[in-house]
Amino acid sequence: MRIMASHDTPVSPAGILIDLDGTVFRGNELIEGAREAIKTLRRMGKKIVFLSNRGNISRAMCRKKLLGAGIETDVNDIVLSSSVTAAFLKKHYRFSKVWVLGEQGLVDELRLAGVQNASEPKEADWLVISLHETLTYDDLNQAFQAAAGGARIIATNKDRSFPNEDGNAIDVAGMIGAIETSAQAKTELVVGKPSWLMAEAACTAMGLSAHECMIIGDSIESDIAMGKLYGMKSALVLTGSAKQGEQRLYTPDYVLDSIKDVTKLAEEGILI
């Protein structure tokens, strides 16, 4: 059921950016009605890009998860902070060497982009920080050595937490804080939503401009902020980090119980 609309004027975005964690999935669980909502949008002729700040997975891993949930997609219709980070480094720092505080998905995207790995932390030009769910002291200490040795810091995102089956789990902000504090260094660039890098990558994947798009997500700080900053329509879902009634820095165009209510917006002629 639709909870709130900031206006009743019908909207007709050509492209839809759909956040994954907290919107389509909660951990590994598919949120009820998500698959059907995506099918509805496709029947309406909408272009769809799946978007996530999760920097510990690759697009291939993400596609496998979506296919396993019965959601067809192409790897080129997936935009992750890991893939956008890799593309940024390839474009602007193609001869630089990186050290990674992160998991295999990020390593895979950097390799696909042709980004060079440093052989040891102190040789790194950049330290790339991302979510690391099996983090060890040795991992953290090697990242510290890279930053203390002068490596510039780029983070896939700076989310404080992300939704999973058990509630919320610590995200990249915890890893960034540990390195910045211990190495007395500052992160130079955060790639993930709501950055223009993510918005541009998503719009480019669809061949559309930002004002032709709508974003659906569970986070005020990343999803709705990105929509508002770059002229997209936005729909907030309450199946993830945002809760009904909380104060919001950015006001979404729509607030929905769940992504499944996208179907209701279409039936009511609000989304056309």
UniProtKB/Swiss-Prot annotation:
GO MF annotation terms: L-phosphoserine phosphatase activity; metal ion binding; phosphatase activity; sugar-phosphatase activity
Keyword annotations of the record: Hydrolase, Magnesium, Metal-binding
The protein's Enzyme Commission number: 3.1.3.23, 3.1.3.3
InterPro entries: HAD-like_sf, HAD-SF_hydro_IIA, HAD_sf
pH dependence: Optimum pH is 7 with 4-nitrophenyl phosphate as substrate.
Gene3D superfamilies assigned: HAD superfamily/HAD-like (3.40.50.1000)
Induction: Transcription is repressed by glucose and by the binding of AraR to the operon promoter. L-arabinose acts as an inducer by inhibiting the binding of AraR to the DNA, thus allowing expression of the gene.
CDD domains associated with the record: HAD_Pase_UmpH-like
A GO CC term assigned to this protein in UniProt: cytoplasm
Catalytic reactions on record: sugar phosphate + H2O = sugar + phosphate; O-phospho-L-serine + H2O = L-serine + phosphate; O-phospho-D-serine + H2O = D-serine + phosphate
Record has Magnesium as a keyword: yes
Principal EC category: hydrolase
Pfam family, one: Hydrolase_6
Cofactor: Mg(2+)
Notes on temperature effects: Optimum temperature is 65 degrees Celsius with 4-nitrophenyl phosphate as substrate.
Family: Belongs to the HAD-like hydrolase superfamily.
Protein's job: Catalyzes the dephosphorylation of C5 and C6 carbon sugars in vitro. Catalyzes the dephosphorylation of 3'-AMP and phosphoserine in vitro.
Protein name: Sugar-phosphatase AraL
